[in-house]
A protein has these predicted regions:
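Non-catalytic C-terminal accessory region of glycerolipid acyltransferases
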Residues: 8-134
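Catalytic core of membrane glycerolipid acyltransferases/transacylases, capturing the structured
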Residues: 1-5
Length: 134
């Protein structure tokens, strides 16, 4: 939210929920692209909540396969599989900033492994091969 008071209330509520031992679903990529199969870049938010409240993140990654059923839109209906990986814990001996980055990197590596195992191909982003525009 662009409203500072709303954000303060949200952040306070998030801390309260996590410190109470409850769970919260956070999409660390902060957006969804319909039927996009590759992991999207992970933002810091979910890992910030985890690190500052000394709680783990539970990496979940959804893969999809075409079914045999052609939808009304001319595309095959997708079949989804939810992969739940082991929890990633913040290290109490490290700073919040280090934990945020390490947890984010570990989550990415888990997603990359799931992607490559499921689809049988290396995770490559086509835009990585494009020249940088200065």
């Amino acid at each position: 939210s662009s409203n500072k008071e709303t954000m303060k209330k949200f952040l306070h509520s998030m801390d309260a929920v996590l410190q109470h031992g409850d769970f919260m679903v956070v999409y660390p990529e902060q957006s969804m692209w319909w039927n996009y199969r590759k992991p999207k870049p992970l933002k810091k938010g979910a890992y910030t909540f985890a690190a500052q409240n000394h709680v783990p993140v539970l990496p979940c990654f959804i893969t999809m396969q075409d079914s045999d059923i052609l939808g009304d839109d001319g595309f095959y209906i997708q079949e989804y599989t939810i992969h739940i990986a082991p929890a990633i814990y913040p290290d109490p001996n490290k700073s919040r900033a280090v934990n945020i980055e390490e947890m984010r990197q570990k989550n990415y590596e888990v997603w990359k492994e799931i992607y490559e195992k499921t689809y049988g191909e290396p995770l490559v982003y086509e835009c990585d091969d494009m020249p940088t525009i200065a």
